Design a protein with these regions (language model features):
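Generic alpha-helical secondary structure signal
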Residues: 60, 64-67, 71, 136, ...
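Compositionally biased, low-complexity flexible segments
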Residues: 1-9
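Short pre-active-site segment immediately N-terminal to the catalytic Zn-binding motif
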Residues: 171-188
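N-terminal low-structure segments adjacent to metalloprotease catalytic domains
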Residues: 8-106
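Auxiliary, metal-adjacent structural segments of Zn-dependent hydrolase domains
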Residues: 69-168
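Catalytic Zn2+-binding segment of zinc metalloproteases
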Residues: 193-208
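Short, structured patches in soluble enzyme cores that scaffold and shape functional sites
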Residues: 167-169, 188, 192, 201
């Protein structure tokens, strides 16, 4: 209590918070709305590093093995974790580095409020320019990440989420570590499928992230 003013400071803070909460949730600008996400996806795809050289046979083999491993990993993950999701095991999407960029940009856009409505706030006269600059910077970050990420479960992708496996990076890491390819690919899938099971068994998690 503020004895000099004869009032309770706690009440003042509560009243201030209550007043702020009356504002519409989308009335303030969000980070996501300051980025041109089309530019981010385009720049990111253009800047991706070349994939490790592989024969067409190896490329087809790793895609087939990752696809099969992503399905095989689901039952043991459900059994060990005790988490169960309704419906059949969904197929993973096996992608290269540029193909990973677009869904990653969409996911980042959703998580940063880029899908929120503008709420009527006045647009800055240079918003289009700054949005493209921010988009180019974001695209550069995505291109950097695209050369190292092995897989990702995106709970905001599509209607039911999507599991992405970046096969050039899987090849690069298994060569670097000199591990058995089949075992390493299964390990990657076990890790990423665990995230998928976490989200599909608890739908509120995706809603919380968005």
């Amino acid at each position: 209590r503020d004895r000099r003013a004869g009032r309770d400071l706690t009440d003042v803070r509560v009243r201030g918070m209550t007043k702020l909460s009356e504002n519409p949730p989308n009335s303030a600008p969000t980070l996501g709305r300051s980025v041109d996400w089309d530019v981010a996806a385009s720049v990111g795809a253009r800047l991706t590093r070349p994939a490790p050289p592989v024969t067409e046979y190896t490329r087809a083999q790793v895609i087939d093995e990752l696809s099969a491993a992503s399905r095989a990993a689901e039952p043991p993950v459900r059994e060990v974790t005790g988490l169960h999701a309704e419906g059949p095991v969904p197929d993973a999407r096996i992608v290269d580095r540029p193909q990973w960029i677009a869904p990653a940009a969409l996911s980042m856009r959703a998580m940063t409020g880029g899908d929120a409505e503008a709420g009527g706030e006045p647009q800055h006269p240079f918003a289009a320019v700054t949005g493209k600059v921010a988009g180019a910077q974001t695209g550069a970050v995505l291109s950097f990440v695209s050369s190292g990420i092995l897989g990702q479960y995106d709970p905001l992708g599509g209607d039911d989420g999507i599991l992405l496996l970046v096969y050039p990076n899987v090849i690069a890491v298994e060569r670097q570590l000199r591990v058995t390819p089949r075992d390493f690919r299964l390990w990657v899938c076990l890790h990423e499928v665990t995230h998928r099971v976490q989200f599909t068994a608890n739908p509120w998690l995706a809603q919380h992230m968005s």
